[in-house]
């Protein structure tokens, strides 16, 4: 049975054929004024086989969202996938895949050096009790350990 074409790019991805961890271009959009938005699928866990626990995912979201901007001014957003297997990295007017991998590598290395999860308090976070620095660092370490495989999506 053929799956119908969906509006959401990731719904058209055959999740049974990917090999996490990986980083792939999920979408490109060109604006009316020439701006280009590129969305990357940054997959940490194998779909339908493993997932990140919420406190670790939540903490890694905070850490990367804050730290990645030290390495790249063109970052628009770093947001978690609802399936808890990865994140989306959205950038503006920057379409250099190799550089994105380098920025992600530097960011994850900085996550390993972090002493606290940024903005993990009730004033700055909607679920402040749901954080673990150690869990986030374990995710970053595991992702970095497979750095040589990030370009191997498997599709």
Curated annotation (Swiss-Prot):
Its EC number is 4.4.1.21. GO terms for biological process: quorum sensing. InterPro entries: LuxS_sf, Metalloenz_LuxS/M16, S-ribosylhomocysteinase. The keyword Iron applies. One of its GO terms (molecular function) is iron ion binding. The keyword Lyase applies. Its cofactor is Fe cation. Fe cation binds at residues 58, 62, 125. Binds 1 Fe cation per subunit. Gene3D superfamilies: S-ribosylhomocysteinase (LuxS) (3.30.1360.80). Keywords: Autoinducer synthesis, Iron, Lyase, Metal-binding, Quorum sensing. It catalyses: S-(5-deoxy-D-ribos-5-yl)-L-homocysteine = (S)-4,5-dihydroxypentane-2,3-dione + L-homocysteine. It is an enzyme of class 4 (lyase). PANTHER family: S-RIBOSYLHOMOCYSTEINE LYASE. Involved in the synthesis of autoinducer 2 (AI-2) which is secreted by bacteria and is used to communicate both the cell density and the metabolic potential of the environment. The regulation of gene expression in response to changes in cell density is called quorum sensing. Catalyzes the transformation of S-ribosylhomocysteine (RHC) to homocysteine (HC) and 4,5-dihydroxy-2,3-pentadione (DPD). Homodimer. NCBIfam families: PRK02260.1-4 (NF002604). Belongs to the LuxS family. This is S-ribosylhomocysteine lyase. It comes from Helicobacter pylori (strain HPAG1).
């Amino acid at each position: 049975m053929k799956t119908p074409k969906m509006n959401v790019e990731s719904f058209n991805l055959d999740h049974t054929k990917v090999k996490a961890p990986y980083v792939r271009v999920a979408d490109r959009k060109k604006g009316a004024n020439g701006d280009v938005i590129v969305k990357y699928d940054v997959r940490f866990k194998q779909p339908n086989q493993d997932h990140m626990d919420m406190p670790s995912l939540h903490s890694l979201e905070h850490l990367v969202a804050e730290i990645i901007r030290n390495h790249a001014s063109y970052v628009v957003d770093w947001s978690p996938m609802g399936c808890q297997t990865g994140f989306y990295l959205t950038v503006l007017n920057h379409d250099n895949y190799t550089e994105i991998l380098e920025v992600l590598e530097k960011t994850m290395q900085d996550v390993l050096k972090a002493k606290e999860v940024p903005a993990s308090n009730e004033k700055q976070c909607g679920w402040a009790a749901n954080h673990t620095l150690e869990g986030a660092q374990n995710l970053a370490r595991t992702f970095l350990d497979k750095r040589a495989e990030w370009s191997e999506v498997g599709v």
